[in-house]
Amino acid sequence: MSRSLKKGPFVFYSLIKKVDQMNSNRFKSVILTWSRSCTIIPIMIGNTIGVYNGKEHIPVLVSDQMIGHKLGEFVQTRNYRGHKKHDKKTKTKR
């Protein structure tokens, strides 16, 4: 189910303030956020946002193709290490 158009996209207010400050300054740094559910809006383009994955902040460089998506879509929360490898030598017949 999608969000109602009259409500608009969800963006954390303090994140917008931080992005505006970075856009007004020449100095660019990583903006840390724990809000993975924020929608990416056009003023965020070109900024690097550190999105929390449950363990650490992963830097995400926002581009124009990301507009309308959520920040959490670009950071994995689970590590897939592959299936266990089986040794044919250690297998015993019964």
From Swiss-Prot:
HAMAP family: Ribosomal_uS19
Keywords: Chloroplast, Plastid, Ribonucleoprotein, Ribosomal protein, RNA-binding, rRNA-binding
Name of the protein in question: Small ribosomal subunit protein uS19c
Coiled coil spans: none
Protein's job: Protein S19 forms a complex with S13 that binds strongly to the 16S ribosomal RNA.
An annotated GO cellular component: mitochondrial small ribosomal subunit
One GO MF term attached to the UniProt entry: structural constituent of ribosome
Source species, domain of life: Eukaryota
PANTHER family to which the protein is assigned, alphabetical: RIBOSOMAL PROTEIN S19P FAMILY MEMBER, SMALL RIBOSOMAL SUBUNIT PROTEIN US19M
InterPro entries: Ribosomal_uS19, Ribosomal_uS19_bac-type, Ribosomal_uS19_CS, Ribosomal_uS19_SF
Organism name: Euglena gracilis
Example of a GO biological process term: ribosomal small subunit assembly
Family: Belongs to the universal ribosomal protein uS19 family.
Subcellular location field: Plastid, Chloroplast
